[in-house]
Swiss-Prot record:
Role: Catalyzes a salvage reaction resulting in the formation of AMP, that is energically less costly than de novo synthesis.
Self-association state and partner proteins as the record states: Homodimer.
Gene that specifies this protein: apt
Protein name: Adenine phosphoribosyltransferase
InterPro entries associated with the record: Ade_phspho_trans, PRibTrfase_dom, PRTase-like, UPRTase/APRTase
Entry's EC annotation: 2.4.2.7
Amino acid sequence: MNLRDYIRDIPDFPKEGIVYFDITPLLAEPKAFQYTIDQLAERFADYKIDKIAAAEARGFIFGAPLATKLDIGFVPIRKPGKLPYETISVSYDLEYGTDNLSMHVDAVAKDENVLLIDDVLATGGTAEGMVKLVEKAGGKVSGMGFIAELTFLDGKSKLSGIDTTSLIQL
């Protein structure tokens, strides 16, 4: 199955000059969505993974069902102020400023192996922030999985030393 067939290009969104890669057609097709989860599970089958963590919101779409398929826990990573319990946070650099990510203080235990999942690897800012957050909690990043990678933005360069995989390269 060619997953690229289920990614819609939206020119000039969210602003002029940007092409947005819309995953909603993939979500609308159950066989394509299941294939996506199965492919991620297959790629990480031999990894030592205790938990999967994913950033809101689209990372949740893929991370939670993958965690269920692998029979491991899921950790939601959110913007500050969105989680009800005590949190730890990190700030990370974006192309035009900084942002923050948070998770519950007890979400990742010391030395737990965590697989990070997100929908798209673009500039690498969010991915780098997720790595910092897991490491701040004392966890180890086992790898990172993405549905698509925008190779022309070279986000992988911010993740040196971390095994990353993408199902689609754009």
